[in-house]
Amino acid sequence: MRERMVTWAAVFQRNAMSWRREMAASVLGSVIDPLIMLFGLGVGLGKIVDSVDGRSYAEFLACGLILTSAMSASNYEMLYGTYSRIYVTGTLKSMRYAPICVSDYLIGEVLWAAYEGVVAGTIVAVCTAFLGYIPGWSVIYILPDILFVALIFSSTSLLVAAISRGYALFAFYQSIAIAPLVFLSGVIVPRFTGNDVISGMIHFSPLYRAVNDVRNVVYEGRGTQVGPLLLLSLLYASVMVFISAKVICVRLDD
């Protein structure tokens, strides 16, 4: 187990050293977009929408954007960064000559992508607290929700990257899966309730669960209940890594 953890740390460190050269652009890119949405939609529509759940629309939107920033950063790193290292630049293929297991390498990649998501989500949370849309104390309490979302979507995007034959699939994945999930999970508008089947499915969406939990913390001051969900996310990530490792090994050995 110790050797495996050393591998995870080595992959994480390698990515961190590479990321350090482009850290400013990466962080700004992950943070500016949700802040633009916050001002554009939150302040703009806030003049039209009186309130949502008893709060201003900007406050309602801020809670969701914290988590979508974590989701987007994790997705982007996994879909483009990890995919390139596996299939384009040959990083993984080169590392396989060393005594390294593909699944251990992928765990390191998932941890790195999740870390980027946590960084992006935390920065957006701090910015929204500074602007007065969420209480400053709540930033600490919503960190588990940010980590939960980052883990779930980094491991999901790993499987998408593993099966993809090119970058074109990523745009399809974003359009057919991520965008509807954002709109239906209560990020921009209250949760969709127009159809019982769809509403029931959204109720179990990880993004909806996390957004709902963050709003409970921010609105009511209740402690986060994300502990069991974090354990579930670790189990889910393990399954995604196992499946992705099988797919990648087959493709690299062709």
UniProtKB/Swiss-Prot annotation:
Give Gene Ontology CC terms: ATP-binding cassette (ABC) transporter complex
The record's annotation in InterPro entries points to: ABC2_TM (IPR013525), ABC2_TM_bact-type (IPR047817), ABC_2_transport (IPR000412), ABC_transptNodJ (IPR005981), Nod_factor_ABC_transporter (IPR051784)
Q: Does the keyword Endoplasmic reticulum apply?
A: no
GO BP annotations of the record are:
oligosaccharide transport
Which GO-annotated molecular functions does the record name?
Answer: ABC-type transporter activity
UniProt subcellular location: Cell inner membrane
Q: Give UniProt keywords alphabetically.
A: Cell inner membrane, Cell membrane, Membrane, Nodulation, Transmembrane, Transmembrane helix, Transport
Q: Name one Pfam family in it.
A: ABC2_membrane
The UniProt transmembrane annotation reads 25-45, 60-80, 106-126, 133-153, 169-189, 230-250
**All residue ranges annotated as the ABC transmembrane type-2 domain in the record:** 25-251
Q: What is its membrane topology? A: Multi-pass membrane protein
Superkingdom field = Bacteria
Q: Decide whether keyword Ribonucleoprotein is in the record.
A: no
Q: How does it assemble?
A: The complex is composed of two ATP-binding proteins (NodI) and two transmembrane proteins (NodJ).
Matches recorded under NCBIfam families: nodJ
User: What functional role does this protein have?
Assistant: Part of the ABC transporter complex NodIJ involved in the export of the nodulation factors (Nod factors), the bacterial signal molecules that induce symbiosis and subsequent nodulation induction. Nod factors are LCO (lipo-chitin oligosaccharide), a modified beta-1,4-linked N-acetylglucosamine oligosaccharide. This subunit encodes the transporter.
Similarity comment: family membership: Belongs to the ABC-2 integral membrane protein family. Lipooligosaccharide exporter (TC 3.A.1.102) subfamily.
* Name of this chain's protein: Nodulation protein J
Can you name the source organism?
Azorhizobium caulinodans (strain ATCC 43989 / DSM 5975 / JCM 20966 / LMG 6465 / NBRC 14845 / NCIMB 13405 / ORS 571)
- The gene that this protein is the product of is nodJ
